[in-house]
Amino acid sequence: MEKTVDQPIIADTSGLVSLVTDTDQNHDPATKAAARLAEVSRPIILPSDVLVETVNVLGKKSGHGTALKAAGELLRPGSQFILIETRPYLLRALENFKDQSPAVSLTDCIVMTIADDYDTKDIFGFDKQFADAGYTRIAPSTEWHEEA
């Protein structure tokens, strides 16, 4: 997944939740991927919708304290995460969404639309639908059984 230092990777909720949750089956691959990206100073674009979805998922799974701590780390000045507003991408994402299977969320379509805009195929996430659509995702744990 290493590219040039300047080429970003786009964050998805699946990767962020795995990164934060040490009991997640994909915690180790997410941690290793984040470390490799940090070593080469590769930015991780954090769509605002992904931040909201991540905080909501973590709040339900692990409690609001964990969710707020994660949000603080993601938004920390100097982190490798760069928060971007997603409104400019919404209409194109909705257009993409209408042709997707029910397994693909609007947030997934926003992530893919932003990846296209940044001219990258790399997604910091584990969802199979990214690979199915021609993007590169983090390789999931061999113990992980994903849903289609």
Where are these regions (language model features)?
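Short, well-structured N-terminal submotif of metal-dependent ribonuclease cores
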Residues: 1-46, 59-71, 145-148
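Acidic, PIN/NYN-like endoribonuclease modules and their adjacent C-terminal/linker elements
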Residues: 1-6, 112, 117-148
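Short glycine/serine- and small hydrophobic-enriched flexible loop segments
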Residues: 56-59, 116
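Short active-site oxyanion
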Residues: 40-44, 79-81, 119-121
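Short beta-strand scaffold positions
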Residues: 11, 45-46, 84, 106, ...
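Short acidic, glycine/proline-enriched helix-loop-strand junctions
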Residues: 73-86, 99-100, 107, 131-148
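Active-site neighborhoods of divalent-metal-dependent phosphate/nucleic-acid chemistry enzymes
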Residues: 82-121
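Amphipathic alpha-helical segments within well-ordered protein domains
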Residues: 17, 52-56, 94
